[in-house]
Swiss-Prot record:
Sequence similarity: Belongs to the Integrator subunit 10 family.
Any single GO BP term: regulation of transcription elongation by RNA polymerase II
InterPro entries recorded: Int_cplx_su10
Cross-link Glycyl lysine isopeptide (Lys-Gly) (interchain with G-Cter in SUMO2), sequence positions: K464
Source lineage: Eukaryota, Metazoa, Chordata, Craniata, Vertebrata
Organism this protein belongs to: Homo sapiens (Human)
Job of this protein: Component of the integrator complex, a multiprotein complex that terminates RNA polymerase II (Pol II) transcription in the promoter-proximal region of genes.
Domain of life: Eukaryota
Record keywords, A-Z: Isopeptide bond, Nucleus, Phosphoprotein, Ubl conjugation
Major subcellular site: nucleus
Annotated protein name in UniProt: Integrator complex subunit 10
Subunit structure: Component of the Integrator complex, composed of core subunits INTS1, INTS2, INTS3, INTS4, INTS5, INTS6, INTS7, INTS8, INTS9/RC74, INTS10, INTS11/CPSF3L, INTS12, INTS13, INTS14 and INTS15. The core complex associates with protein phosphatase 2A subunits PPP2CA and PPP2R1A, to form the Integrator-PP2A (INTAC) complex. INTS10 is part of the tail subcomplex, composed of INTS10, INTS13, INTS14 and INTS15.
Subcellular location: Nucleus
Positions carrying Phosphoserine: S231, S381, S382
Length: 710
């Protein structure tokens, strides 16, 4: 028998004995190895027995022997590959843990050599990168030799694979795993331009990761049912997984914290003017403002260095705080446990003073049954005031019940605005920031456009805000699936109310009403009218005039519909109380004044005075929409001798009836009787839900309402 045949016989005999007598099998193999020490199959069979018996130390020694003595055997490398895969695996099963333990028994030098050789045999870029990353983590001394090369390979792979989003497996491995190893190792020498390149890549990745649902999740989840303003977008509870990575590897804890740590390390390596210790975002911004003041005093090299410091520091403060603001007012855009429960908010001009600016001589006309409370508070300022002043410190009214962390949210809004202003305050900052934004395609970020729109509204630049809202609509169209007819998205409804508030601030009252009336189609009824304004409890009254205040309102029918009615009242009020007679506008005002009664009582009395001065009044929709008992009593009184015998044409076709017939005592009496019966019927309607009545008014009379403002 040949030597090869002898070896095969001995190995086969040992295999047969394994199930019956393990020790006998091992004895056969020990004998065989003594006889044929250069035979690989004998060594491998011994290793297999020990591995299957999960004897870590013995299996490790045998694997080491094979690695040293038979380095060219494919079976050895297949075994090593299985072990290194277990090292990268998140699984905690028994077999995986055994393989990890087996690897740990090997000498460090051998581990390092094994990982390097396995890496060389990987043809898949991602697998090769993960293998090399394993080496860098276990043997930090290898970072100097392999760290930058691995980082560049990952960035190159991202380009070659034509990844659409910065949130991809290659960028994630580079930013979260490789980059910290490189920049925190002071033996790795990196030029400043490479550090800035890496900081840029990290910032783009983390910002897109945090805000990823805006661009990614909506595409996968399709149309969302947002038939009511009140309903935040429904969201998937499934965890986000980056393609090519495991679920565990895709989750990043404290991404903002990680990003600012990278900023600090890069800053120290580039010799920026750094502060010791942890500083708030406000402190960072303040420091950057100071640095900008004496930028021109530096030589060109220092100027370039500090320019990068200001741009990157301010930019990250901007994006962090802009995100914080949008995440608080519209959490459904982003992932998070609070997303389904919190109602979104929308920033609008405050028109709650719509009932003000009325000066009345009460002695001219006071109903005998009406006693006005002497101490009733009057609103001091008027919505007619110029609200478009581009103030830097406008007051934002917000109800803490609707936004518990309102102080922090408004502070984030302020810091983001100031950061934005700083980035555009100097030409060289503007140029660099614009370059970065173009590369990152920030004009496609829906969440950022929401912030920018609110910022522009805050600044009082309403024409720009309208353009921004149209940009927002275009973004929503490119991201969202087509909606079911009649179910406008939450974003579409937010845009309508913000368009209305901007047109109003510009004095474009017909456009204001057009947007408001479009929005009325989305209102979900019934809404209870509690008499008092919905925003009244939340109002914190500033010491100075509040003509240019803003407010954050919940995106619910209950909050938005009263606001819409305020806007309409403000539009028609201006037309109704001019010197020119406009009974239609005056009638619309009277209908709208029913909301929050008796807050609009003074304005109603002004309307009554105007009617008295005219001596007559025609509004044929009166009995369709006026159900307020005080108003009905007042109009009934106007027809009496004591009330001035005012000629009122409030019934449909009443004018035609009188015009086309000879006015006889009988017909006049008939008209009076019709008026009396209509008034009695109307009194019986006083219990109707006022919001339903006013909603019907807006829907049914849309054409008439818009014609009145033409």
């Amino acid at each position: 028998m040949s030597a090869q045949g002898d070896c095969e016989f001995l190995v086969q005999r040992a295999r047969e004995l394994v199930p019956q007598d393990l020790w006998a099998a091992k004895a056969w193999l020990i004998t065989a190895r003594s006889l044929y020490p250069a035979d690989f199959n004998i060594q491998y069979e011994m290793y297999t027995i020990e591995r299957n018996a999960e004897r870590t130390a013995t299996a490790g020694r045998l694997l080491y022997d094979m690695f040293v003595n038979f380095p060219d055997q494919p079976v050895v490398w297949r075994e090593i590959s299985i072990i290194t895969s277990a090292l990268r695996n998140d699984s905690q099963d028994k077999q995986t843990q055994f393989l990890r333990s087996l690897f740990e028994t090997l000498p460090g030098r051998v581990q390092c050599e094994m990982l390097l050789k396995v890496t060389e045999q990987c043809f898949n870029t991602l697998e090769r990168s993960e293998m090399l990353l394993l080496l860098l983590r276990r043997f930090p001394e290898t970072v100097v030799q392999h760290g930058v090369g691995l980082g560049e390979a990952l960035l190159e792979a991202e380009t070659i694979e034509e990844q659409e989003s910065p949130v991809n497996c290659f960028r994630k491995l580079f930013v979260c795993d490789v980059l910290p190893l490189i920049i925190n190792n002071h033996d790795v020498r990196l030029p400043a331009n490479l550090l800035y390149k890496y900081l840029n890549k990290a910032a783009e990745f983390y910002i897109n990761y945090v805000t990823r649902s805006t661009q990614i999740e909506n595409q996968h989840q399709g149309a969302q049912d947002t038939s009511d303003l009140m309903s935040p977008s429904k969201r998937s509870s499934q965890k986000y997984i980056i393609e090519g990575l495991t679920e565990k590897s895709s989750q990043i804890v404290d991404p903002w914290e990680r990003l600012f740590k990278i900023l600090n390390v890069v800053g120290m390596r580039c010799e920026w003017q750094m502060d010791k210790g942890r500083r708030s975002y406000g402190d960072i911004l303040h420091r950057m403002k100071d640095l900008c003041r004496y930028m021109n005093n530096f030589d060109s090299e220092a100027h370039a260095k500090y320019k990068n410091q200001v741009v990157y520091s301010t930019m990250l403060v901007f994006f962090k705080n802009a995100f914080q603001y949008v995440n608080s007012i519209q959490p459904s855009l982003f992932q998070g446990p609070n997303a389904p429960s919190q109602v979104p908010l929308v920033l609008l001009e405050d028109v709650s003073n719509v009932y003000g600016d009325v000066e009345i001589d009460r002695n001219k006309h006071i109903h005998k049954k009406r006693k006005l409370a002497e101490g009733r508070e009057k609103t001091m300022s008027s919505d007619d005031e110029d609200c478009s002043a581009k103030g830097r410190n406008r007051h934002i009214v917000v109800n803490k019940a609707e936004l518990a962390n309102s102080t922090e949210v408004l502070e984030s809004f302020k810091l983001a605005r100031e950061s934005w202003e700083l980035l555009y305050s100097l030409e060289f900052l503007d140029k660099e920031f614009t370059r970065i934004c173009l590369a990152w395609k920030t004009d496609t970020w829906l969440w950022l456009r929401i912030f920018l729109t609110d910022m522009i509204i805050y600044q009082g630049q309403y024409k720009k805000a309208i353009a921004s809202l149209h940009h927002l609509a275009a973004l929503q169209g490119s991201i969202s699936q087509p909606q079911i007819t009649g179910q406008g998205t939450l974003e579409h409804q937010r845009a309508l109310i913000q368009l209305a508030t901007c047109h109003f601030a510009l004095g474009e009252y017909r456009m204001t009403c057009e947007k408001v009336l479009d929005l009325m189609c989305y209102m979900v009824l019934p809404i209870q009218d509690g008499g008092k304004s919905q925003e009244e409890p939340s109002k914190v009254k500033p010491k100075f005039r509040k003509g240019s205040d803003l407010k954050l309102l919940p995106c619910t029918s209950k909050a938005i519909m009263p606001y819409c009615l305020h806007l309409m009242l403000a539009c028609f009020k201006l037309r109704a109380f001019t010197d020119n007679r406009d009974d239609m506008a005056l009638g619309h005002v009277i209908v709208l004044l029913q909301q929050e009664w008796p807050r609009g009582e003074n304005l109603f009395l002004k309307a009554v005075n105007k009617i008295c001065q005219q001596g007559n009044f025609q509004y044929e929709n009166f009995f369709n929409y006026v159900t307020n008992i005080d108003m009905l009593e007042e109009f009934a009184y106007l027809r009496t001798q004591e009330g001035g015998k005012i000629h009122l044409e409030l019934l449909p076709n009443q004018g035609m009836l009188i015009k086309h017939h000879t006015v006889t005592r009988g017909i006049t009496k008939g008209v009076k009787e019709d008026f009396r019966l209509a008034m009695e019927r109307q009194v019986s309607r006083c219990g109707e839900n006022l919001m339903v009545v006013l909603h019907r008014f807006c829907i049914n009379e849309k054409i008439l309402l818009l014609q009145t403002l033409t």
